[in-house]
């Protein structure tokens, strides 16, 4: 491959497709974690390219908390149907029985039970030995030091001090029974790369990424979009219509919007050129405590 003649986006694309094909060939039962966000959309697009004109040789897995935006659920089902993907949806039955929700139990407990434990349940249920994730190194400091092939023990835990060297695009996928690998094909992409690639490839995304007038209220320094009636307003809180969009998507009570007028992909790309903050600044779960993301990943988080 002539690296000099490839644009940086095509180099990233080629690297990601190589990783996806390597995993499909090397592991017996891989799965692609599908969170419905922009990174998942890019990863799914790359996987479809990797095996075109055939179908994906692995299913998609969505770990559902029951608190995603309604537009995300609609997009998930429409996308899986349009591309003919096998879609597995898992919701932690114990969490559902306990009535876990982010307002009553807080973001840390909600995330641990509905996302981390839910994910581990699904991986155990289907005996997946490799799981693709859409995490990128530029998102957050614990992800910055994680390998593309992220080794997990039989309890799905990550030990940042026990990572394997990855030299010259050679990946060590050797695991023992019960162990697994999380694989991050987008590790070397930036948020700007993701948006430029979405524009270049005309990839469909959830409309929440584009600015529009939406009902929001300010709570704990975050602009919370009110997506349904499962919220009790606190004294003095007022729901107002404001021009906002989302840089990252998750559970609607835990994902802050940003004020923006970017209604098209070129406008988002232009906005990113002058941005000085991480896209995850609106994620409440990242602020639960110092080193929050690394602690979650050590316990088995995405």
From Swiss-Prot:
Heterodimer composed of CysD, the smaller subunit, and CysN. The keyword ATP-binding applies. NCBIfam families: CysD, PRK05253.1, PRK12563.1. Keywords: ATP-binding, Nucleotide-binding, Nucleotidyltransferase, Transferase. Pathway: Sulfur metabolism; hydrogen sulfide biosynthesis; sulfite from sulfate: step 1/3. The gene is cysD. This is Sulfate adenylyltransferase subunit 2. It is an enzyme of class 2 (transferase). Its EC number is 2.7.7.4. Gene3D superfamilies: HUPs. Belongs to the PAPS reductase family. CysD subfamily. With CysN forms the ATP sulfurylase (ATPS) that catalyzes the adenylation of sulfate producing adenosine 5'-phosphosulfate (APS) and diphosphate, the first enzymatic step in sulfur assimilation pathway. APS synthesis involves the formation of a high-energy phosphoric-sulfuric acid anhydride bond driven by GTP hydrolysis by CysN coupled to ATP hydrolysis by CysD. It comes from Escherichia coli O9:H4 (strain HS). SUPFAM superfamilies: Adenine nucleotide alpha hydrolases-like.
